[in-house]
């Protein structure tokens, strides 16, 4: 009985995680569409200068990207469409911040850490663009 309840709980957690991921995918897609549609409004007179990361591994530049978003938000006229863009970006940042909290983990034995390290390096090797 305990095993069955555990499996049900794991299944529910999986469904919940997939629902959140699916919602986030839709939110990102909607935000990309809004950015494309309202780019002229966001550019304004074109004189605003925002520090933009040169690094192509966007995962490493999250803080800088969101600092740029804050700068843009503070310097852009706030119509309904623009409010929606910045509300979406705020929700995306909250999601990323929640995910980052998972980085602080418990202590593991060396073998478990080395297994994690191998997966981590594999992601760097396959998903990150290497710059020289």
Curated annotation (Swiss-Prot):
**Residues annotated as glycosylated:** 74, 88
Q: Name one GO biological process term.
A: immune response
- Where in this chain does the entry annotate a coiled-coil region? none
Predominant place of localization? secreted
The cross-references to SUPFAM superfamilies, in alphabetical order and at most eight, read: 4-helical cytokines (SSF47266)
The subcellular location is: Secreted
InterPro entries noted in UniProt = 4_helix_cytokine-like_core (IPR009079), IL-5 (IPR000186)
Cellular component annotations (GO), alphabetically ordered? extracellular space
Q: What family is this protein classified in?
A: Belongs to the IL-5 family.
| Function recorded in the entry | Homodimeric cytokine expressed predominantly by T-lymphocytes and NK cells that plays an important role in the survival, differentiation, and chemotaxis of eosinophils. Also acts on activated and resting B-cells to induce immunoglobulin production, growth, and differentiation. Mechanistically, exerts its biological effects through a receptor composed of IL5RA subunit and the cytokine receptor common subunit beta/CSF2RB.
Query: Per its record, how is this protein called by name?
Result: Interleukin-5
């Amino acid at each position: 009985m305990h095993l069955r309840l555990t499996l049900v709980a794991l299944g529910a957690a999986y469904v919940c995680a997939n629902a959140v991921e699916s919602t986030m995918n839709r939110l990102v897609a909607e935000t990309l569409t809004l950015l494309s549609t309202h780019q002229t409004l966001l550019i304004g007179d074109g004189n605003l200068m925002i520090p933009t990361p040169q690094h192509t591994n966007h995962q490493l530049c999250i803080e800088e990207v969101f600092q740029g978003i804050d700068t843009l938000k503070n310097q852009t006229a706030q119509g309904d469409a623009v409010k929606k863009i910045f509300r979406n970006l705020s929700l995306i940042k909250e999601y990323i911040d929640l995910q980052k909290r998972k980085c602080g983990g418990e202590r593991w034995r060396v073998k478990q850490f080395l297994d994690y390290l191998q997966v981590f390096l594999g992601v760097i090797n396959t998903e990150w663009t290497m710059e020289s």
